[in-house]
């Protein structure tokens, strides 16, 4: 039994980008879809789509990479360099609007679950709401 499906999704994304996969699949849920909408809007992934695998709903995540590097390592640059779960089932992390972290001084994003929906750190600050700190990405 999976105790933290969000951490599982983030781990699948992290592992797939490390081996330069084109896409990866995760079991579907509305909450995961909201997180993926933010990642796509902020440019961390190309997009996602709903698919059926053996009659079960899945989300196929299309990963994004930068241009090929020069030198001895010609692999493309990873767009997602770091993706980490912060609030977990065993240790929930809630922040008020004044405690929302700035990830990499604004180069990365924090994703929060708020009363106004799933938002980035910038959107939550703009709307003046805090919430549960789901993850950080840069």
Swiss-Prot record:
Q: Does the keyword RNA-binding apply?
A: yes
> Which GO-annotated molecular functions does the record name?
rRNA binding; structural constituent of ribosome
A GO cellular-component term linked to this record: ribonucleoprotein complex
- Where would one find the signal peptide in this protein? none
Gene3D superfamilies xrefs: 3.30.1370.30, 3.30.1490.10
Cite the entry's keywords alphabetically.
Answer: Ribonucleoprotein, Ribosomal protein, RNA-binding, rRNA-binding
Q: Which GO terms describe its biological process?
A: translation
Under the subunit heading, UniProt states: Part of the 30S ribosomal subunit. Contacts proteins S5 and S12.
Protein family per UniProt: Belongs to the universal ribosomal protein uS8 family.
Q: What does this protein do?
A: One of the primary rRNA binding proteins, it binds directly to 16S rRNA central domain where it helps coordinate assembly of the platform of the 30S subunit.
Its name, as the record gives it, is Small ribosomal subunit protein uS8
Name the gene that codes for it. rpsH
């Amino acid at each position: 039994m999976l105790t933290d499906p969000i951490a599982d999704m983030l781990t699948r994304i992290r592992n797939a980008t490390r081996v330069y996969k084109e896409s990866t699949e995760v079991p579907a849920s509305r909450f995961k879809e909201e997180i993926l909408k933010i990642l796509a809007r902020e440019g961390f992934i190309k997009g996602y789509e709903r698919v059926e695998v053996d009659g079960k709903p899945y989300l196929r995540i299309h990963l994004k990479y930068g241009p090929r590097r020069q030198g001895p390592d010609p692999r493309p640059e990873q767009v997602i360099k770091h993706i980490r779960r912060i609030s977990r089932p065993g240790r929930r992390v809630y922040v008020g609007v004044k405690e929302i972290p700035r990830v990499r001084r604004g180069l990365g994003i924090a994703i929060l679950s708020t009363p106004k929906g799933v938002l980035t750190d910038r959107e939550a600050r703009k709307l003046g709401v805090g919430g549960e700190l789901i993850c950080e990405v840069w």
